[in-house]
């Protein structure tokens, strides 16, 4: 019986995929197809929730099949991330886009990411205080106990890693290993390796222009092929969003969400407020924030449904270059750094809120100005340190809580709502990296404002 029900669910999913394909054949805009996929995925997931239990075998097996589309799409994006970063950054050097301002570009992007993370921490603190979020009364079940054990094991290894060791982890001792994404710091390591190749190219160009020109032509050919691969994968975005959204909603435990409803609500209020701050920063830079919102919507939608900042990188880079008019070098640096450094959602809002929740349990008044200022500073600085250990929100929270001498057990107690909150956090992370790239490009005078201000026509190219 279960097999029949699973078959029906999969058949419905395939029909919905067929509808999206029909929309593509009718040349419905890319944005509309992504938005349709998001809405239909939510509705389909809710229907499955209503018919079955989230933990039922039917839902579990159906989600496994849905994963062929959703997780398959994410894996394709992850496949292209490293080649895209490597080729794009080297290409930026060969096109003389990163010859003079390399240090200024890197410093400005990282500075904006860390600054906005500090602001995000303040927003998280305000949301926690406003909604009176507290760890008191949270119960530890079997799932939470298992998660706590894993958290404590991981924390032990993080605690032993010194700051110099974290910084050394960023260097690519084996670039071919990092191209496989084997280490938490692989993304930044590939950026550094690509920058070294680019700098070497500039030196070779001065002494041996013929060899440099040959390398440039070869790289241009590889770049064209990689970008064609990116375009082919991006066309699958609506199908990936549909499957990921249906899978997430169908498998969510509504009862657990309701128990931690106050925390979930406070988290999303903080995420929305921080996103509005991104728009305000863009407006203060002399750019139209509505134009930004319209052009990055598909990227944020995918980040929301996939919960993968790294998986969203190809869309992130494509949107920055082709839609926002950001120069190639800045777009690649902003997207790459944003995966590991200064994540507004995972390393900003989330750790700050957990610290505010757990502080009263050890006799600390979380509303004391000294505690708040210290927490904001620790969150901002730690958001850079996370780059050396990886692990996203969980380990960002571990670093902050341990630095503040607070219990780390709270990280395990919110496991039941982790997927739901992580969706919003990831979207904010990606928005933060694009905001950093946009503002940096504007301040350095490298923004193509004609591209930024024109109507979005690039989505049509992806669709064709």
From Swiss-Prot:
**Primary residence:** membrane
Q: Where in the cell is it found?
A: Membrane
Q: Which residues form a coiled coil?
A: none
Extract the GO molecular function terms from the UniProt entry: L-cystine transmembrane transporter activity; symporter activity
Query: How is this protein positioned relative to the membrane?
Result: Multi-pass membrane protein
- GO cellular component term of the entry, any: plasma membrane
| Membrane-crossing segments per the record | 3-23, 34-54, 73-93, 107-127, 184-204, 225-245, 263-283, 347-367, 371-391, 395-415
Q: Which InterPro entries match?
A: Na-dicarboxylate_symporter, Na:dicarbo_symporter_sf
List UniProt keywords, sorted A-Z.
Amino-acid transport, Membrane, Transmembrane, Transmembrane helix, Transport
* Function recorded in the entry: Mediates uptake of L-cystine, the oxidized form of L-cysteine.
Q: Which family does it belong to?
A: Belongs to the dicarboxylate/amino acid:cation symporter (DAACS) (TC 2.A.23) family.
This chain belongs to which protein, by name? Answer: L-cystine uptake protein TcyP
């Amino acid at each position: 019986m279960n097999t029949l029900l699973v078959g029906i669910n999969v058949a419905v999913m395939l029909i919905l995929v067929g509808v999206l394909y029909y929309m593509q054949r009718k040349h419905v805009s890319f944005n509309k197809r992504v938005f349709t996929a998001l809405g239909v995925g939510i509705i389909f997931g809710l229907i499955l929730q209503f018919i079955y239990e989230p933990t039922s075998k039917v839902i579990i097996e159906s989600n496994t099949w849905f994963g062929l589309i959703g997780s398959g799409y994410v894996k394709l994006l992850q496949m292209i991330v490293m080649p895209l970063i490597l080729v794009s950054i080297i290409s930026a050097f060969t096109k003389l886009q990163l010859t003079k301002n390399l240090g200024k570009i890197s410093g400005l992007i990282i500075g904006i990411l860390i600054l906005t993370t500090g602001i995000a921490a303040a927003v998280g603190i305000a949301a926690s205080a406003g909604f009176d979020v507290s760890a008191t009364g949270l119960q530890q079940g079997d799932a939470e106990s298992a998660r706590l054990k894993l958290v404590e094991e991981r924390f032990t290894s993080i605690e032993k890693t010194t700051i110099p060791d974290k910084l050394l982890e960023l260097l690519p001792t084996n670039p071919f290993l990092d191209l496989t994404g084997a280490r938490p710091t692989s993304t930044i390591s590939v950026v550094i390796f690509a920058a070294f190749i680019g700098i070497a190219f500039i030196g070779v160009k001065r002494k041996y222009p013929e060899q440099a020109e040959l390398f440039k032509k070869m790289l241009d050919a590889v770049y064209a092929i990689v970008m064609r691969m990116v375009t082919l994968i991006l066309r699958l975005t609506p199908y990936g969003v549909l499957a990921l959204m249906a899978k997430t909603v169908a498998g969510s435990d509504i009862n657990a969400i309701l128990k931690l409803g106050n925390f979930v609500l406070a988290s999303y209020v903080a995420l929305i407020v921080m996103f509005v701050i991104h728009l305000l920063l863009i407006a203060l830079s002399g750019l139209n924030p509505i134009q930004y919102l319209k052009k990055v919507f598909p990227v944020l939608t995918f980040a929301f449904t996939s919960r993968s900042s790294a998986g969203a990188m190809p869309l992130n880079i494509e949107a920055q270059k082709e839609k926002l008019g950001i120069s190639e070098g800045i777009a690649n640096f902003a997207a790459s750094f944003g995966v590991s450094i200064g994540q507004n959602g995972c390393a900003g809002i989330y750790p700050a809120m957990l610290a505010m929740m757990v502080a009263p349990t050890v006799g600390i008044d979380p509303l004391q100005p000294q505690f708040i200022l210290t927490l904001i500073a620790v969150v901002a600085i730690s958001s850079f340190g996370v780059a050396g250990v990886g692990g996203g929100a969980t380990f960002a929270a571990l670093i902050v809580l341990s630095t503040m001498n607070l219990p780390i057990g709270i990280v395990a107690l919110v496991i039941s709502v982790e997927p739901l909150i992580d969706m919003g956090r990831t979207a904010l992370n990606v928005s933060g990296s694009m905001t950093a790239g946009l503002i940096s490009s504007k301040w350095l005078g490298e923004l193509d404002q004609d591209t930024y201000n024109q109507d979005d026509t690039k989505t049509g190219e992806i669709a064709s």
